[in-house]
């Protein structure tokens, strides 16, 4: 089976939200390790696109100013594209709670627009990025991403004559991504803050590096049948240990859980254990619906064999068997 380098050779790839942390890392990896024909960055911010164009300076890159809320613009941008990575989202949990309709327009209606445009343009493969907050959601952001996941999974059933395959990749917090807690804590340290705010001493989170996230998406392109949700096996970390790693000499202050926050995140809920398959370094959540063409998710397209998990299995950040200590996080940074 070809590796992702060969698989992307001579392919045109479009990434929505391509100027974000994931998008920039994804584009860099594809440019550096493949002979992709063209990479199209589709996003709203002209300044970020201008800065990215100067930073990367590669003739294979194209930039489209556009919003995923704009179906007509997406249809135009996706002409001649082979692979679409959907990374655009409004993802800030408290802001989504205060601006729910805006979050719904981008994360749900935007997802629907991406699906429709990909079907119209007969895109070969589509992967949508999801989040651990989509499992058992208690906040609006997580609920919109759950809706998005359902839309992408079900798209495999109404594709008609198109051969488009839609899959989802779900993972946890990305170490150092824009707007995340790591740069926030770092800035507090730089500004010589007298204390580091912690919402709850029990809080845990899943963690993955940007490079690991990008590699997992590229590997999922090789593995996918369409309709599955890919979940990597990644470590957890206590938020108190995160504070110790980044600010070992600064006291912490418990400020209480923010709107929409959970104590622990879940990537595979117990109620979905009957759908989960375990592989060496990842899981697959099989779709709840059946498709016109049956798919055997126990065997990936890389011929990796999966096994059913235990009936009461739950993949949560607090019952994980992989843990990051403060020194481990510093190595990742």
Swiss-Prot record:
Binding site for substrate: 91, 173, 181, 199, 258, 261
Keywords, in A-Z order: Lyase, NADP, Nucleotide-binding
Residues reported in the UniProt entry to bind NADP(+): 19-22, 43-48, 67-68, 87, 91, 129-130, 141, 145, 174-178
Domain of life: Bacteria
GO MF annotations in UniProt: lyase activity; nucleotide binding
Reaction catalysis annotation: UDP-N-acetyl-alpha-D-glucosamine = UDP-2-acetamido-2,6-dideoxy-beta-L-arabino-hex-4-ulose + H2O
Necessary cofactors: NADP(+)
The EC number(s) this enzyme carries: 4.2.1.115
Outcome recorded upon mutating residue 133 to A/E: Loss of activity
Coiled coil: none
Function statement: Catalyzes the first step in the biosynthesis of pseudaminic acid, a sialic-acid-like sugar that is used to modify flagellin. Has both C6 dehydratase and C5 epimerase activities that result in the production of both UDP-2-acetamido-2,6-dideoxy-beta-L-arabino-4-hexulose and UDP-2-acetamido-2,6-dideoxy-alpha-D-xylo-4-hexulose.
Family note: Belongs to the polysaccharide synthase family.
Subunit structure: Homohexamer.
NCBIfam families: PseB
Protein name: UDP-N-acetylglucosamine 4,6-dehydratase (inverting)
Gene of this entry: pseB
């Amino acid at each position: 089976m070809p590796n992702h380098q060969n698989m992307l050779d001579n392919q045109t790839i479009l990434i929505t939200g391509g100027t974000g942390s994931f998008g920039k890392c994804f584009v860099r990896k594809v440019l550096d390790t493949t002979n992709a024909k063209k990479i199209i960055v589709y996003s709203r911010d002209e300044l970020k696109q201008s800065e990215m164009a100067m930073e990367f300076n590669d003739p294979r890159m194209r930039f489209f100013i556009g919003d995923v809320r704009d179906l007509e613009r997406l249809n135009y941008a996706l002409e001649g594209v082979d692979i679409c990575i959907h990374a655009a989202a409004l993802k800030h949990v408290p802001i989504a709670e205060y601006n729910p309709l805006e979050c719904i327009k981008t994360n749900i209606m935007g997802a629907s627009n991406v699906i429709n445009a990909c079907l119209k343009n007969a895109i070969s493969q589509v992967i949508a990025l999801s989040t651990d907050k989509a499992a058992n959601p208690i906040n609006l952001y997580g609920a919109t991403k759950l809706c998005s996941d359902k839309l992408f999974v079900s798209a495999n059933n109404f594709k008609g004559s198109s051969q488009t395959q839609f899959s989802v990749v779900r993972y946890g917090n990305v170490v150092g991504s824009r707007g995340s807690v790591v740069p926030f804590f770092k800035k507090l340290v730089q500004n010589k803050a007298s204390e580091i705010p912690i919402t709850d001493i029990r809080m845990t989170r899943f963690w993955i590096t940007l490079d690991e996230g990008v590699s997992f998406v590229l590997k999922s392109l090789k593995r996918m049948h369409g309709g599955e949700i890919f979940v990597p096996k990644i470590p957890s970390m206590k938020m108190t240990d995160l504070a110790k790693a980044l600010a070992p000499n600064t006291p912490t202050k418990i400020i209480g859980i923010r709107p929409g926050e959970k104590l622990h995140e879940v990537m595979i809920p117990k109620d979905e254990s009957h759908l989960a398959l375990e592989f060496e370094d990842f899981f697959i959540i099989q779709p709840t619906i059946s498709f016109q063409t049956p798919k055997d998710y126990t065997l990936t397209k890389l011929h990796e064999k999966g096994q059913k998990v235990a009936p009461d299995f739950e993949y949560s950040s607090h019952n994980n068997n992989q843990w990051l200590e403060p020194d481990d996080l510093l190595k990742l940074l």
